[in-house]
Amino acid sequence: MNQYLAVTSNGMENLLVEELTKLGIENAKPVQAGVKFKATNEQIYRCCLWSRLASRFVRVLSEFTCNDDMDLYLSTSSINWVNQFHSSKRFVVDFNGTNREIRNSQYGAMKVKDGIVDCFEKKGLPRPNISKERPDIRVHVRLHKDKAILGVDMVGSGLHQRGYRPESGRAPLRETLAAAIIMRCGWDGHQPLLDPMCGSGTLLIEAAMMAANMAPGVKRKQWCFESLEDFEPDTWAEIKSEANVQARRGVKKVDAKFFGFDNDPKVLKVAQENARRAGVEELIEFAQGDVATITRLSGFENGVIVSNPPYGERLGTEPGLIALYTAFGGQLKAEFGGCKASIFSSSDELLSCLRMRADKQFKLNNGALPCHQKNYSIAERSADEVKGADTNTQIAPDFSNRLKKNIGKIGKWARKEKLDCYRIYDADLPEYNVAIDVYGDQIVIQEYAAPKNIPEEKAKRRLTDIIRATIQVTGVEANKVVLKVREKQKGRSQYQKLGQVSETLEVNEYGVKLIVNLHDYLDTGLFLDHKITRRRLGEMAQGKDFLNLFAYTGSATVHAAVGGARSTTTVDMSNTYLNWAKDNMQLNGCIGRQHRFEQADCLQWLENAKGEYDLIFIDPPTFSNSKRMETSFDVQRDHIKLMTNLKRLLRAGGTIVFSNNKRHFKMDEEGLAELGLKAQNISSQTLPLDFSRNKHIHNCWLVTHAE
């Protein structure tokens, strides 16, 4: 007998022990991400062919203390490699791990290779060749701290490669993991099995192969143990022949029914082709279907639903996934009473959207991603009970009630004002710390970063509730909900690009048409707290020369132009936003040489600007480090210097509309008086109803000549 290590994923060790025991292995011992045991050649051949859970089997030749490269070389060269494989065989070293002295796995592999070839040379034999592309032998090394395991891989390519799925295909779930999910889902091998989001069909194919008692390795063409010196071809031929016969007979004896649905017809074709290659196509019925509308199938009494729904990690996918899981849970309860369900996901928050209590749960890894598998018993309920439960279940009641109240009040005001864009919630309740804005038929939820004393899991669960409640209260479709995370920004980082969706939306603000982008940037191109300021600028602009500094996307310029400004000058450092401003102007028919756009650092532009203007709007950042200037800008510290330059451009009888977002900003009225200017605080007049709870969102001033 030889010592072996069966390699598997974290969380599958005990399941693998059970499987190996059924295959005739005694005293199998679980270790981290593996199982150790002893076996004869016949037993290991059978394990390689029949294991659904192991990713590979390694014959352990040595376990040793490895402090440095010399320990590694000496331990390797002390093994009698001639007894393992012939010098004509090509080999490769798979080296996993590092320690304080062996810091590079390639270097570790080289030292092992040296030890092997030197062993052959010392016995007067030719050096075996290295081949990374098509090796006959794979030497396996696992190093952790000062402990090393060295052996030969019995398999070759991973055992998850059953041969029915092309490696080029999309495979979010490895076959070994799919088998573990099936083994733990509560299915007895005879009940009908349904995967309503089957994708490429891996879960159903693995289950069908189990029901048919089909060896998972029956389609494999090459095994590394066939190149070992102690290979027993007759024993292997007999084991393989038995498995082939069993595969043919087993398919005909299956009494379970398998159903796979997916809303993507292209993916379904892939699933059908995979099932054909696996030899179980006649057992599985694939059809196009949506998980949100799936109904109980004929003959599905006491069936099992198993699924691996999407659980995307990228910011912005959450609203759609929350709606998907919510709809899935609703359909399970409405249509599949008396059945069982087993759902696999990396997100406990998404699983909570099913609104079902799990009977059992298991922890497994999908690659490096920690995941949960939860098993549910679905209670039998009448249609009226299901409908009543759905109607009466309110998510996050305090938040939902506040949102309803705000929508009633603010929505009515927005319709009267002819506004497409407005805020319906602004962290009204401290525990639900988000801002929610309406943009036409879409909604943007901005999550303010949670305080450090709030546990991450609690913050995630609360955000999930917010999104679900917002969808429920507003009735908006999930694909029209956009999620952003807002943290304290420095300089112009709020303008940095987040993505590349490039999907824009045209909105209306007091009769002015504007373009917003809800996806690609932290901000959307329109600061909603300044809507009344912009309207006022439009009312003041008739027949005047208008200057807009720190113009962003030029929305204030558009209001001024639509209001009848004689000319407009729009200045911003970003060429992206200047082009956006041009598009906004063109959308409203405001084109011509009287409308100028200048890309420049506004502070430096002011130092050298010439000309006079009747109306100037300036909304500078609270603080800025300009690359083109030697010093920083602080609006509290530097606003008098700013006004000094602005006065030079302000025509007699003209007005500066000066705004900023610094809380508790204090205007230096004495400094203004010395310049011959005076200021009137109009902040309360420019605060719209939807921002009435946040009276310090901005401050706004009218600055004019004192005389």
UniProtKB/Swiss-Prot annotation:
State any single GO MF term.
rRNA (guanine-N7-)-methyltransferase activity
EC assignment: the record states 2.1.1.173, 2.1.1.264
- State the UniProt keywords alphabetically: Cytoplasm, Methyltransferase, RNA-binding, rRNA processing, S-adenosyl-L-methionine, Transferase
User: Which cell locations does it reside in?
Assistant: Cytoplasm
| A Pfam short name | RlmL_1st
| Predominant place of localization | cytoplasm
* Location of the THUMP domain: 43-154
One GO cellular component term of this record is: cytoplasm
The highest taxon in the source lineage is Bacteria
Record's catalysed reaction(s): guanosine(2445) in 23S rRNA + S-adenosyl-L-methionine = N(2)-methylguanosine(2445) in 23S rRNA + S-adenosyl-L-homocysteine + H(+); guanosine(2069) in 23S rRNA + S-adenosyl-L-methionine = N(2)-methylguanosine(2069) in 23S rRNA + S-adenosyl-L-homocysteine + H(+)
Q: Which family does it belong to?
A: Belongs to the methyltransferase superfamily. RlmKL family.
PANTHER family, per database record? RIBOSOMAL RNA LARGE SUBUNIT METHYLTRANSFERASE K/L, RIBOSOMAL RNA LARGE SUBUNIT METHYLTRANSFERASE K_L
Q: What does this protein do?
A: Specifically methylates the guanine in position 2445 (m2G2445) and the guanine in position 2069 (m7G2069) of 23S rRNA.
This chain belongs to which protein, by name? Ribosomal RNA large subunit methyltransferase K/L
Q: Which organism is it from?
A: Vibrio parahaemolyticus serotype O3:K6 (strain RIMD 2210633)
